[in-house]
């Protein structure tokens, strides 16, 4: 089994916001590029810790899910085996995130 790496969104920003870098600081695109992508390429499992921020825009969550889904598909990785979610501050966020993953799987088909 591969190693598990923990990535805290709060280490990136406490104000996650936009979908794309061009839309401003704290974007999902930047978070994916700086924190997630390398670990998927290295085939490490990832625990994304969504705690200790001021909340999440749907644009941030949906873009992050889409990028993760795309990368997993390219690498022939099972996203549900590679990605684990921690969200004690907002328990419903886990369900929302997996919903976006499921939607993005349909988009990427």
Question: What annotation goes with each model-predicted range?
Answer:
Residues 1-6:
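Small-residue-rich anion-binding loops in enzyme active sites
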Residues 96-109:
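The feature marks long, low-complexity, polar/acidic/proline-rich intrinsically disordered regions embedded
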Residues 8-44, 48-98:
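Amphipathic alpha-helical interaction surfaces in cytosolic regulatory modules
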